[in-house]
Amino acid sequence: QGSGSACRSLWGGFVEWRLGDDDDGTDSHGVPLAEADHWDVAMVVAVVHDGPKPVGSTEGMERSRLTSPYYERWVETAAADVDAARQAIASRDLQQLGEVMEASTFKMHATMHTSRPPLLYWHPGTVALLHEVQAIRADGMGAWSTMDAGPQVKVLCSANDARSVAERLRPHAVRVDVLRPGGPAALESP
């Protein structure tokens, strides 16, 4: 079983992961929103831990669904967050996309933190990186954090700011990578 979000990797550029109608999510799918050259943005990925997660994403989300008092509210707000993100991508509004993305990330982690037993994927480096992203913003540079169910912090910023953001994050991470929107999935021969 793979990640449902992998459907976003089939197309290049900006892709929305849409729910399907099936309760088990097997008919979820990716829908292209814009080509890779639509917007000159970057995602700076700060890796703080290379090992496996203590609880896998599927098991963790099921635990959150069943036990977190915040899970339903997170789900209820997801459609509005996706709409705002879609609009931000269409209009190339980095601040709007960053704000909605970061808020959604913290809502998701709130559901995990309030699960029983709690799911705490964060490491000390994770918290240091989240503080550093806020400091970068306070210094006037557009940078917003996002995370999946794990300890790594990804930072959305303009492509022009990516190198500076990466340098600010480097002291708190074991590795920092700068990624840009790419093309569609392709098979390559060895």
Language model features with spans:
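Gly/Ser-rich oxyanion-binding loop with an adjacent helix/lid
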Residues: 1-40
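C-terminal nucleotide
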Residues: 33-190
